[in-house]
Amino acid sequence: MSTQDERQINTEYAVSLLEQLKLFYEQQLFTDIVLIVEGTEFPCHKMVLATCSSYFRAMFMSGLSESKQTHVHLRNVDAATLQIIITYAYTGNLAMNDSTVEQLYETACFLQVEDVLQRCREYLIKKINAENCVRLLSFADLFSCEELKQSAKRMVEHKFTAVYHQDAFMQLSHDLLIDILSSDNLNVEKEETVREAAMLWLEYNTESRSQYLSSVLSQIRIDALSEVTQRAWFQGLPPNDKSVVVQGLYKSMPKFFKPRLGMTKEEMMIFIEASSENPCSLYSSVCYSPQAEKVYKLCSPPADLHKVGTVVTPDNDIYIAGGQVPLKNTKTNHSKTSKLQTAFRTVNCFYWFDAQQNTWFPKTPMLFVRIKPSLVCCEGYIYAIGGDSVGGELNRRTVERYDTEKDEWTMVSPLPCAWQWSAAVVVHDCIYVMTLNLMYCYFPRSDSWVEMAMRQTSRSFASAAAFGDKIFYIGGLHIATNSGIRLPSGTVDGSSVTVEIYDVNKNEWKMAANIPAKRYSDPCVRAVVISNSLCVFMRETHLNERAKYVTYQYDLELDRWSLRQHISERVLWDLGRDFRCTVGKLYPSCLEESPWKPPTYLFSTDGTEEFELDGEMVALPPV
């Protein structure tokens, strides 16, 4: 037999021990210390308190009078909050919500309960939004919580135009204000916004803040202000302030050349779930700048998430929801050939894209799991509509609404019918949902659905976009009468794509000019609004051929489509046919430009190193 001791670990013992300590606490058995807060007594065990709190550990081990006392009075502590911490010490369960978390953090900071502090930090970071980010910035600064402070500051920078009028912004300390106004990452399109924010803060309490006039104004990049603004500003200043203003602005001169991050934004087409150029992954996320004709890499959704819904809000926030993820025990590798062998799980995930960090940030999940839900933003709320789901017909009818300020979902009235697929757009604060030849309108203020005029053609998997008071329903598959067979929309040889327009004021559909397409192509049409113009992004070639993409622009007065841009093969590779396409404003400096790589079809077996691309001969780069 082996002379070594055999070690066996009973994992249930720790749980049993904690439960027994909790029982002793509830029955006040073997307690050796009484905490007194606001007249309320809390009989406890020194050993338990010292285990979770550095404050109590130091108190009981100091050798001072407190270590020998049986009753200890705690000041600057709330009784209800202390009860939460004591419960955590005995059970590991921490109860907190939006109304208690800040007081809980303050008390945990005083008592030095690091586990509670970390849980509170994580909770607050997850809850940061435009309404509370300035207040949480001051809160984090007060308690020297750097992780929370940086997260709150990023949200202040991102939502600057929405937060600088808030009372919390007016209450900012001078140092925090300078830290914000000096930031290169402010999401502002005009320096006038920064100037206005600075002046509002100074004028909030002129008497006490006049001493900061020079230091605050030195953060304004005057060279970025229009001449009209500069002239009007100086003319409106009191005579005694003009010299101070000039002195303050002079200090900002070295920063004149540096634009704020928001001034560098470019409108881009965002492709989620595009076929990856990387053989080791199934999908990729990229964005294309029509102005610069460049492609940038986006961080792909976590955990190989795909079949999601996507939306870009009027405030330029990007969200994805739902979808599927591979089951870990069935996914053998990441290669494309294993895709059919992989089992998937439908999820209710919900993510916000942090454009500055180029990363997806998890938010509160939806109430239902969904595959390819239709996402829209209406009156400040995000709606997740229908989508395929494991719940069958009932789940396909469900609709839920997300409150961006509260970070929570609530159910609203369900769809009148259940569909596996639908398209949704927003016009005049109403949501229009379309599929086949049907359309329903949702009125948020009355939480009701109304059936609208039917389309002339029955099509599924079409692309829809709202432009002004019109809705465009483009492409898709025709549903043949009686047989149910799906055929590509447009002409028989695929040389055009069907377009229908809905007038929301007249409640009527009409046929519009078809979009020209190459014969026998597989266009994979996506309708988008770019630079205040209705456009379609589409493929010119069949899926079995080399991918070539173009954008067409619609002229509403002439009812005509014209070629807007031919996208070089060197820029976009084959995106497949299942990609999501939206339009949003992103920061090129925060993205990685995607270098062009010759596709595998360009390499010939005879060793040829030159080929034709975009109408010209190109030599392969050296290996």
From Swiss-Prot:
Recognizes the BCR (BTB-CUL3-RBX1) E3 ubiquitin ligase complex substrate, PIK3R1, through the 4 tandem C-terminal Kelch domains. Kelch repeats lie at residues 317-380, 381-429, 431-469, 470-529, 535-581. This is Kelch repeat and BTB domain-containing protein 2. InterPro entries: BACK (IPR011705), BTB-kelch_protein (IPR017096), BTB/POZ_dom (IPR000210), BTB_POZ_KBTBD2 (IPR030586), KBTBD2_BACK (IPR047074), Kelch-typ_b-propeller (IPR015915), Kelch_1 (IPR006652), SKP1/BTB/POZ_sf (IPR011333). GO terms for molecular function: ubiquitin-like ligase-substrate adaptor activity. Keywords: Kelch repeat, Phosphoprotein, Repeat, Ubl conjugation pathway. Pfam families: BACK, BTB, Kelch_1. GO terms for biological process: gene expression; glucose metabolic process; lipid metabolic process; phosphatidylinositol 3-kinase/protein kinase B signal transduction; proteasome-mediated ubiquitin-dependent protein catabolic process; protein K48-linked ubiquitination; regulation of cellular response to insulin stimulus; response to insulin. Gene3D superfamilies: 1.25.40.420, Kelch-type beta propeller (2.120.10.80), Potassium Channel Kv1.1, Chain A (3.30.710.10). Residues 31-98 form the BTB domain. Component of the BCR(KBTBD2) E3 ubiquitin ligase complex, at least composed of CUL3, KBTBD2 and RBX1. Interacts (via the BTB domain) with CUL3. SMART domains: BACK (SM00875), BTB (SM00225), Kelch (SM00612). The lineage of its organism: Eukaryota, Metazoa, Chordata, Craniata, Vertebrata. The modification Phosphoserine is found at S300. Residues 133-229 form the BACK domain. Pathway: Protein modification; protein ubiquitination. Substrate-specific adapter of a BCR (BTB-CUL3-RBX1) E3 ubiquitin ligase complex that acts as a regulator of the insulin signaling pathway, modulating insulin sensitivity by limiting PIK3R1/p85alpha abundance in adipocytes. Targets PIK3R1, the regulatory subunit of phosphatidylinositol 3-kinase (PI3K), for 'Lys-48'-linked polyubiquitination and proteasome-mediated degradation. One of its GO terms (cellular component) is Cul3-RING ubiquitin ligase complex. It comes from Homo sapiens.
